[in-house]
Amino acid sequence: EFAELEQLLYFLVDEIKEEDEIIVVVDETNVHRNVTELLYHIGKSEENINFNWYEHPLNKDFSKQKNFLNSKCSGDFIFQIDADETPLSNLIDLLPQILSGNPHIEAYWVPRINTVEGITEEHIQKWGWMVNENGWVNFPDWQMRIYKNNRDIKWEKPVHEKLEGFKQFSHFPPSEEWCLYHHKEIKRQEKQNKFYNTI
C-alpha cells in the first residue's frame, strides 16, 4: 500500500485547509522502512501543516486502531480515510461548507468507487459482488467515514467495523464527484479476504 499511501498523503497536503490536521496511524507490528521515511519526510518538509503520525499495534482489531486514531484528533470532525483510498478534490473543497451548514448531522455516509484489477467472473460469483458498466464493484458501497469528534462516537467490531454512538446522519450523493476512490489488484484482494477470515 506504499504507493497508495504516498499518493493520498501528498493529495491531502495540497488540499487541506490551514485549520485542518493530518493524522496517520500505522501498525507498529508491520512498519515498512519506506513508509517511515515518507512520514518523516512529510513531517519535516511540510512544516506549515498540522501533520502527526503514530505507531499502534493492529492486533487484528480495526476498531481499536480507528478509535486510537480518533483519540489523536483535535478537530470538530474526523474524515477517516484508509491508506488505499483517495477522495476527490470536490469533496474536500466543499466539506467545510457542508459540515457548517448542517450542524445537527453527526455522521455522513460517503459513497465509494471500488475497482479491482484482474477480477474475473469467478471472483464475482464467489464473493457475491455486483459490478456495474463502469467496472465499479458494489457501488455505491456506502462508508461511514465523516463524523463528529465526540468520545461517544466510536468504532465497534474487530473487522467490518461499525460506527456507533451518533443519532443524526446523512448521505452524500451517490455520484462520482462525492466518492472515495478505492483501487486494488486481485492478488491483494484475495490476501486481504483471507486475513479478514482469521479475525
Each predicted region: which residue ranges?
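Catalytic-site signature of metal-activated, phosphate-bearing donor transferases
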Residues: 62-70, 77, 86-199
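Conserved acidic residues
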Residues: 20, 51, 76, 84, ...
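Solvent-exposed polar/charged
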Residues: 14, 71-72
